[in-house]
């Protein structure tokens, strides 16, 4: 239960971070290179505005399975995860009303380029949190599956 609370806290922090982007320029869609035109004043924002050092890979881990709410779940992650024997931090992003992970893909890729495993789904109404819970269950299952690229790769601490 503590692990889920911690993961939900991370979700909330990332949601607030993403909200700052939408409030800054709500009239425009997120483009592939949104970080180039974003004018940041803070040192932290300037440091992380550009892409990170990791090449990003993307994988669909569940496609409309009933046990996971009939949503598609996708994961963006540092490609080095496939070959390095280490654990990586995971971020689960919940979409806003009528949005999906497909529409916000540049943000998912951006976070993955900084070394995060980033999970998203196609649930357009995440307010009740069911798809978040199902997504966490799915990632726990993949982290325990020897055949999965995510086997023992998710940092749960």
Where are these regions (language model features)?
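Sec/Tat signal peptide C-region and signal peptidase I cleavage site
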Residues: 23-26
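Short beta-strand element of the alpha/beta-hydrolase
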Residues: 86-96
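Gly/Ser-rich "nucleophile elbow"/oxyanion-hole loop immediately N-terminal to the catalytic nucleophile
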Residues: 82-86, 130-157
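Bacterial N-terminal signal peptides
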Residues: 11-20
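Short amphipathic alpha-helix adjacent to the substrate-entry channel of hydrolases
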Residues: 102-120
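Solvent-exposed loop/turn segments at secondary-structure junctions
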Residues: 81, 96-100, 118, 123-128
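N-terminal cap/lid segment of alpha/beta-hydrolase-fold proteins
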Residues: 28-86
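Bacterial N-terminal signal peptides that target proteins for export
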Residues: 2-11
């Amino acid at each position: 239960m503590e692990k889920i609370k911690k993961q939900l806290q991370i979700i909330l922090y990332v949601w607030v971070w993403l909200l700052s982007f939408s409030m800054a320029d709500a009239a425009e869609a997120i483009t592939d290179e949104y970080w180039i035109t974003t004018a940041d004043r803070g040192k932290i924002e300037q440091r992380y505005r550009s892409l990170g050092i990791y090449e990003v890979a993307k994988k669909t881990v569940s496609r409309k399975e009933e046990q996971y709410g009939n949503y598609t779940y996708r994961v963006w992650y540092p490609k080095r995860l496939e070959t390095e024997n280490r654990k990586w931090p995971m971020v689960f992003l919940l979409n806003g009303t009528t949005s999906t992970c497909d529409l916000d893909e540049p943000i998912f890729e951006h976070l993955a380029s900084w070394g995060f495993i980033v999970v998203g789904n196609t649930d357009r109404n995440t307010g009740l949190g069911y798809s978040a819970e199902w997504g966490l269950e799915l990632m726990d299952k993949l982290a325990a599956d020897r055949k999965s690229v995510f086997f023992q790769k998710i940092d749960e601490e």
